[in-house]
């Protein structure tokens, strides 16, 4: 199972379906991992500050992860040994694929709803509330996700 998966592919979806239960969660945080879940382990950040969930691969395996998908580049010698476990699957450029992998695992919920993104420096919260309110008046239930929280507009 340790053959390199260079890009997201149908084979990765099939691998997840074969080795993880349908109710398994995908996580990069071992504190949230339960037996049977799938760990996504990869470095994130920039030159000044990096966080690397790959250091938790041994813990994920001991907690009973069904699979560990990990970024294989620049892996320490210790982790190279740990990742010989058949539950570990190297995925090149994993950080760039997490959104697609997660979306596919959850049957792409955003494909079945209208999503409106608001960008800019000022006024995003106000505009999001206005849009949600306008949609609600048309009997289109709306939720808002932003820096002030997330939820349905009453």
Language model regions located:
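N-terminal leader/targeting and accessory segments in enzymes
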Residues: 1-100
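Phosphate-binding loop of NTP-binding sites
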Residues: 96-154
């Amino acid at each position: 199972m340790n053959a390199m998966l260079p890009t997201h592919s149908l084979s990765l979806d099939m691998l997840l379906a074969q080795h993880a239960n349908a109710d398994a969660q995908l996580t990069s945080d071992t504190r949230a991992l339960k037996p049977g879940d799938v760990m996504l382990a990869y470095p994130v950040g920039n030159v000044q500050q990096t966080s690397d969930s790959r250091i938790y691969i041994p813990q994920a395996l001991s907690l009973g992860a069904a699979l560990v998908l990990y970024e294989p580049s620049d892996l320490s010698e210790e982790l190279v040994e740990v990742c010989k476990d058949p539950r570990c699957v190297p995925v090149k450029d994993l950080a760039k694929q997490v959104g697609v992998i997660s979306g596919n695992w959850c049957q792409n919920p955003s494909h079945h709803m209208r999503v409106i993104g608001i960008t800019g420096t000022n006024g995003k919260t106000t505009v999001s509330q206005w849009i949600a309110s306008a949609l609600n008046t048309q009997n289109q239930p709306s939720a808002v996700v932003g820096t002030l929280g997330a939820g349905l507009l009453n």
